[in-house]
Every structure is written in structure tokens, then in C-alpha cells.
Regions:
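Structural signature of tandem alpha-helical TPR/SEL1-like repeats
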Residues: 93-99, 128-149, 170-182, 203-217, ...
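Amphipathic alpha-helical segments of tetratricopeptide repeats
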Residues: 106, 185, 220, 254, ...
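Short coil turns that delineate tetratricopeptide repeat
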Residues: 109, 155, 188, 223, ...
């Protein structure tokens, strides 16, 4: 454990080493130095800890610990300032971070870490402008160049390897994994690299348990790492655990009260739990958080709209739709069209809902990651299947449900929260029952309950599937 305090040109570093098995203090030290001595203190602290542990560091380990990548205190200071702003997850602060990194590069053009900082910051920035194709192509080209430069200047810098992995993960590129693993080999305490491997398992492979393992490892290393905390909640919710997700998200909001995606996932958790009024009230209190980018404003009105539809407040939806129409690219994104068609379903106009979702699925829709388009198609298939069930057209419902993607991949938190994939077999069960095929209905309910085996017992679909399965088994 330790802390760093700076006053003017003086810095105080305190450190202590504790045996976690018995809480026994093994070592403690205080270092008061001029800021110009900061790199020497870094070496001194590392060596002191190694001596207490009676570890003999290899030459490579000494080099890695001692490496500052720059002899310039000013460049180092600018990098640290930029890094602080880059993890605030707001577009204005990310631009500030990029400015600090560029200033550091002007002072020391061979300093690898600011290049990595720019690449990581611009990758994050690409999510905030997700609907501007020209901007995305330009910024991701810049990301790749800066990530390559960082690795060329600092091949043994964990942050450089991580940044390339972060960029490739953004592209859903399988090679991301090797860069992220290399980052962890170079720095086993790199929390964000652990988080990004969790992202890799969740986004590209749909392995929820493996993803959770890595998110939790990341949070042990850094409990305040915003993306790891968020993605742990998101994955928990994808497992159907709304109650657990709500506990986690309240802790996350205490740590990150000004990060909009925590508010977005709380709204999703309340909606899954059937607390539609609470979801609406909560989003109304968060409006000021969603004003810094177009993507955030779309998220805000989209959340309000979903809540209003589930509360049957159809007369208030027109106002939400009008607000969405004032946001650039509204006609090329999913929010306006999804809400329009969802409203048709809940108003009982099932044929129009089918036609609307079909047209929506066959149109151009801007999404911020390539593998999200199939997620959106599945959601359209889901609502078309629900509509066909209401119309008693069971074979058409089955046909829609058979078109789902084969596994639960894709991070859909900036799209529509994807709880639909496991529910496809629940709807199949309803359709087969409607057709009188009780054996297929039973198999479908069993598959649904297996897919969502960790889900809350009080979710409506879980309770209904169990009851229907019980009756089918009794009848057979």
C-alpha cells in the first residue's frame, strides 16, 4: 500500500508492505524528495520492497522497474496529467488528455507512453462519436499509427502493448488477445489489460463466465477502474441477474457518479427487474449527464422512451420521438425506429409492428462496432416473433427465432440491452405449445432455463417457463 502527495516541487511517497494472511506489517518507509528525483525514488522503492521480500531481481526486471522512458520531468508530468484526464470518460476531458500527451511528445518525441496515451484516448473517443462514419475512420487510422509508434519506441512497455490490444479489440480483431496477454506479462498489475481480456471473451466469444473472471481480476487490481466495474454489471445482467446487478450498479454509481454509462446500465437493470416506473424516474434525474455528446443524448431519450412504453404512457412518446428527431443522424440510428415499432407492438398493432421491424432490419443502421449489427437483427427477429405469437402464426414465429445468431456475442450497451438471445427458446416453447407440439415445447423451455440457469428466479419468463414445463411433464 502507499500514497503520493505533491506540494510545489516537493513530493512525499509513503509505502508499506503487508502480509495479507495475518495483516502483519513487513515494511514501511517514507521518501521526501524533490520532484526532479522522482525516477530515482521509483528505483529506490522497488529495490527496497525486493530486499524485504528477499527477491533477487533479474537485469530485465530491474530495467523494467527503473525505466521511465524519458529523462524529462516535464514530459513525465504532462503524461501523468493526460492519463488522469483520459480515464474520466467524458469527451471534453479526453480531448484535454490528448493535448497533454501531445505536449509531452513535443518535449520528448521518443517517449513511448504519450503515443500510447493518444491511441488509447482516441479509441475511447471513437465510442462517443459512434454515428459519424467519416470521423470514426479518421480517428481509428490515427489510433493505429500512434499505437504502432508506441510499440516501436517502447516494445517492453506494457501500456504500449495494451493500447494496440485495446484498439484491435475495438475492431473485433482476434489478434487483440496476444497484445493484451503480452501487456500482462510485462506488467501483471495492469488492471485495464485484464479488463480488456474480459471484453474479448464477452464481445467476441459470448463466454460470460470467463469474462466475469477477468473483470473481477481487473477490479481486484483497481477497484475504481470504470470500464471493468461497468462490464461486470453488464455481464451480470446478461446472465439474467437483475437483483445482483442493481446492488453492483449502486456501488458503481458511488464511485463514478458522473459516468453516463453507469446510469444507462442501472436503467437497463431496473427495466429487466420490471421496475418500469423506478427506471423512468431514475433516468429523469440523470438528464444533465447526457449532454456532452450526441450518442449520450440518444441514449437518454431512448431510455425514457422504453420506460414510457412499458408504462403504457403512449401519449408521452410523441414528445420523446420529436426530441430524438432533433439529434443528428437520428434517422440512421436505431433509437427512433426501435421506439416507433416497439410502440406499435404494445399498442396491439402487431401486423404494423412486424412490417416496421422488418423494414428496420433491412435498412442501413449505424452501429459503433461491426459485430453489433447481428445483435440488432436478432432483436428485430424477437419482436417479429412476439407479434406472430400474438397473431397465432406460430410457424412464422419459429422461422424468426431460427434466424438468431449462434451464440451470445456482442456488447450491446450502446444499442439495445441484449436480453433477447436466451429468451428465443422461451418464445419457441410458446410457439410449439400453440402448435400442439408439446415435446418440442418442453425441449425449448429446458434449453431456455439452461441458457439462463443463473437468472433470477423472479423474472417473469423464468417463472412462466418453469410452470409451463411442470404442466407439460405432468401431461406426458
Amino acid at each position: 500500500e502507499g500514497s503520493v502527495r505533491r506540494v510545489g516541487n516537493r513530493v512525499r511517497i509513503t509505502g508499506q508492505l503487508i502480509n495479507t494472511a495475518n495483516d502483519h506489517h513487513l515494511w514501511a518507509e517514507k521518501f521526501d524528495r524533490d520532484i526532479e528525483d522522482i525516477f530515482a525514488v521509483q528505483d529506490e522503492v522497488a529495490t527496497a520492497i525486493a530486499n524485504v521480500l528477499r527477491i533477487k531481481l533479474s537485469d530485465e526486471e530491474v530495467m523494467l522497474i527503473s525505466s521511465s522512458q524519458t529523462e524529462s520531468i516535464e514530459a513525465y508530468d504532462l503524461y501523468i496529467k493526460g492519463r488522469s484526464f483520459s480515464y474520466s470518460y467524458s469527451a471534453p476531458n479526453i480531448y484535454k488528455a490528448i493535448n497533454y500527451f501531445n505536449e509531452a511528445i513535443k518535449i520528448d518525441p521518443n517517449y513511448a507512453l504519450p503515443y500510447a496515451g493518444i491511441a488509447r484516448s482516441k479509441t475511447t473517443l471513437s465510442f462517443t462519436q459512434a454515428h459519424d462514419d467519416t470521423f470514426i475512420k479518421k480517428i481509428l487510422t490515427e489510433v493505429e499509427l500512434h499505437a504502432e509508434k508506441a510499440i516501436a519506441l517502447g516494445p517492453k512497455e506494457a501500456e504500449a502493448q495494451f493500447t494496440m490490444g485495446y484498439y484491435l479489440n475495438r475492431q473485433s480483431d482476434e489478434s487483440a488477445y496476444e497484445y493484451l496477454k503480452k501487456a500482462i506479462e510485462l506488467n501483471p498489475s495492469h488492471a485495464h489489460a485484464h479488463d480488456e481480456i474480459g471484453d474479448y471473451y464477452l464481445d467476441s466469444h459470448g463466454n460470460l463466465d470467463e469474462a466475469l473472471y477477468w473483470f473481477e481480476k481487473a477490479l481486484k487490481l483497481d477497484p475504481d477502474l470504470a470500464p471493468a466495474g461497468f462490464l461486470r454489471i453488464y455481464t451480470t445482467l446478461k446472465k439474467g441477474q437483475a437483483n445482483n446487478a442493481l446492488v453492483l450498479v449502486d456501488d458503481g454509481l458511488k464511485r463514478h457518479p458522473n459516468v453516463p454509462f453507469y446510469s444507462t446500465i442501472k436503467h437497463a437493470a431496473l427495466m429487466m427487474a420490471g421496475k418500469y416506473h423506478d427506471a423512468y424516474k431514475f433516468m429523469k434525474t440523470q438528464e444533465s449527464l447526457y449532454q456532452t455528446s450526441r450518442v449520450e443524448m440518444l441514449d437518454f431519450y431512448f431510455g425514457l422512451g422504453q420506460s414510457l412504453i412499458m408504462l403504457n404512457k403512449f401519449d408521452e412518446i410523441d414528445n420523446i420521438l420529436e426530441k430524438l428527431k432533433k439529434i443528428k443522424y437520428y434517422d440512421q440510428t436505431h433509437e427512433y425506429r426501435y421506439l416507433t415499432n416497439l410502440r406499435l407492438y404494445y399498442e396491439g398493432d402487431y401486423r404494423s409492428a412486424i412490417n416496421g421491424f422488418n423494414a428496420f432490419d433491412n435498412s442501413v443502421v449505424l452501429v459503433f462496432m461491426n459485430n453489433l449489427r447481428p445483435v440488432l437483427s436478432d432483436i428485430c427477429h424477437y419482436w417479429k416473433a412476439k407479434s406472430y405469437l400474438e397473431l397465432g402464426e406460430f410457424e412464422n414465429a419459429i422461422d424468426e427465432l431460427n434466424q438468431f445468431r449462434p451464440n451470445f456475442i456482442g456488447l450491446s450497451y450502446n444499442l439495445v440491452f441484449d436480453e433477447f438471445w436466451p429468451k428465443r427458446n422461451y418464445l419457441k416453447g410458446l410457439a410449439y405449445e400453440g402448435m400442439g407440439d408439446n415435446r418440442s415445447a418442453q425441449e425449448s423451455y429446458e434449453k431456455f432455463l439452461k441458457d439462463w440457469s443463473d437468472a433470477d428466479d423472479d423474472l417473469l419468463e423464468i417463472m412462466d417457463a418453469k410452470e409451463r414445463l411442470r404442466k407439460l411433464k405432468q401431461a406426458s
